[in-house]
């Protein structure tokens, strides 16, 4: 069937901010689909609230909307753009839920929009647990015994009938949010109560437990003519009971017999058929009882998912692209296989290698959270590695995780840790074998298949052999074939990594590169996509004779280093291509656009370690390597690359070192006459106490060389300081801790700046909305700034100019400043792309990363900017021609843009929601408005914390904040809000003539503040931290397993209750001030105004 001619315009919904369970894979699949639809001749409209995405770049669609993903905003866009069809299968759970709501409210019918890619009843059959169960039973497929309940009593009754443990799954939630496993009645009460709140339809499914069964997934594709293929089988190394997003997975499945695989394949076809998926990709999960062979269908996703991104990268088969084309009427035998260029998409991929995916966790960011893995997803990113054998792929994947140090294991409790999996699970399996446990014993505790355990035990046996045969060439070869890195072998032999590298070179032990070609080398591949192996002879990655630039990616997503860096990398690749270079991408993250087969000229899917990068350099001999676009990951290895005489493109490594080393940096600032907050460094507790005494408390403590503020804190007392220094010493041994005077009540600014060595251009001047001391990655910010005088902006431009010239920046850099009493202080400078580059590019309409990349290969800045000139500048600044001054004019858009962050607190009940200098957000949204108030209000809606316009407010404000907070609360009372407050706050309000209802604090009588919140009477909580309330320490102190921090203050109880009840909360005076302005704006009239992104640049 050829493509459909009855539709011309297609609306695609993106997945919004990155959260746990919904990450960069949707930008990758969305970008792929947009390219496919445009090339098939359709007009495409994209809506997404996340500016850090390639899919919201204007060149991929006919109209881009960066607006909140709510039905109200979508209806406005549909009314304005009049699409013929809506494709909801590319934006994860978010887009599916919105499509269902748009259909059920009659909005799609009203504007004549048809759903393509998945029918409404199919989405419901797949997503509604009860309907899914009925549908499967009708099709003759076995599912787990389960019952849907909407209250606690029925849940308890069901659990008694099924017997504990039972699994609880809330309906229509993402990444298992609100679910869990209950082993007894007490746990059931707790999980069901939470689950009923989390589920948008307030129902949960109680399901019989299949803990310990094996879990498999099939990625399948079907077209309108009934053709059906399995793209990839994926086996979860971890058994059922751990969310598949938190499991180590292997493709293709290793322990299925052929008979079992055929049975599963047939079942998958029946599932798709019964649900009614006529076109597109789906992911189907099965559980298999290894004892009896009983197989049940667990669930299916009628959309592109995290697993389909993995399957695409593992096989080279672009599921999202194919699914988009199937949705508009093509069939599989009409779509080419883009990798071979010769076969069709109807061919099932076959692969002659093994792929391992391992999740990346960051539970240390959420003290008090339960580290045990269960059906609720907790990981923030993942890595993928390819090898010829399972051992080789596993070894490569483990080193791709970039875990700086081996996890501290609690060897006395190995058995307990094997039975209760945590993120360190795999380390405990290896530790068990090192301590003499056998495969049977470990299998009993973990239920990991014996085949995998035997493979892992063999690795430990090899380590023993290595110890016995030091410097033996044959054993070195074997270790390399089994996936061991030079560094690991060096540790076993007690020598340096360099010595092992030399030994390999002397004996000509090098990896060869093999191709990912979808067809096990049966046809010639057109798009070069490679992995390394020591299990091969022929090198398939034959370099061309073109000039090459190699770009290092940012590895697995994590807090502090997310999709924003991938965005910059991809823009870099395109720019270098436009300048005539061949581009080589190196990365290990399967979720990203950078690892798409058609982004760069050559893709190496490899770990970002010194060893792996040097081997690729040896093979490709690039003109230079780019380390400035991938966040901290490439910077960490830059030093070693320079030692091996690899050319670094852009800002020199010397400048990077000066900026990272506080002593050198302070010296440089002094030379050029700029200020930084007074500071000292300390290598011991005594020294730290001395330094802090001299500076005066509060002080900011942090280790050197770190991203995302790991182990950083604001400290008010010597006792707290002592605790922290002990902690930070663990983070970077051999590097001293830095202690800064903390500037209270300063305005913090974030500057993204570009320079070609002569000219300096501030691309984005952003003002942080949260007070100084909140990590800039966790603070909302606004562009252009709202509280700077003209004189101050000029001084900032001068300051930045001096610093950028002194650091000899070539390309892009990020500078953080604080302004206190009209004085400018430099907090830090990073001579690399920062996480705000995509936001700035979208706010000003100029692609910052692309310009920076071109400068790195010698282009001139004014000439590159002239393409976008004239752009809006500050009122009163007139510029006729670029380049008259070395300071180029700072863009000053007419529209205001607010970046707001999304923090996954609800995934970690037990963690306090106060913000501090340690970064904890996973993603971001952007709100655009005519003034700051509108932009802030839209950003709050987009981040899922919509501000109320009516109702009651609960206020409890610290003494130091009362002077500023009281008039703001009085404003809210004038706007008709009822105000409830605790004693001290109520007194301050009453003295200003504000009517208040006094509420007792916890322990002062009932009903107290917590009761009030639990009754659902409150629509907004304002609570700022008082100085007598210590912040929860942001790190866990290697306690016995599963113990929770003991400091539970009243403030903590209020904040966590608000979070649990989904009541919006404000924890700083700054955010309260912004919220008051936004609420006033919302009361005056609708803020549901939508504008094309490109129109916001023309205002």
Curated annotation (Swiss-Prot):
Residues the record lists as binding Mg(2+) 3: 816, 828
Every ATP-grasp domain range: 133-328, 666-857
MGS-like domain residues: 945-1099
Residues the record lists as binding Mn(2+) 3: 816, 828
Matching CDD domains: MGS_CPS_II (cd01424)
Database matches in Pfam families: CPSase_L_D2, CPSase_L_D3, MGS
Pathway: Amino-acid biosynthesis; L-arginine biosynthesis; carbamoyl phosphate from bicarbonate: step 1/1; Pyrimidine metabolism; UMP biosynthesis via de novo pathway; (S)-dihydroorotate from bicarbonate: step 1/3
Record-given protein name: Carbamoyl phosphate synthase large chain
Species per Swiss-Prot/TrEMBL record: Thermotoga maritima (strain ATCC 43589 / DSM 3109 / JCM 10099 / NBRC 100826 / MSB8)
Name of the gene encoding the protein in the UniProt record: carB
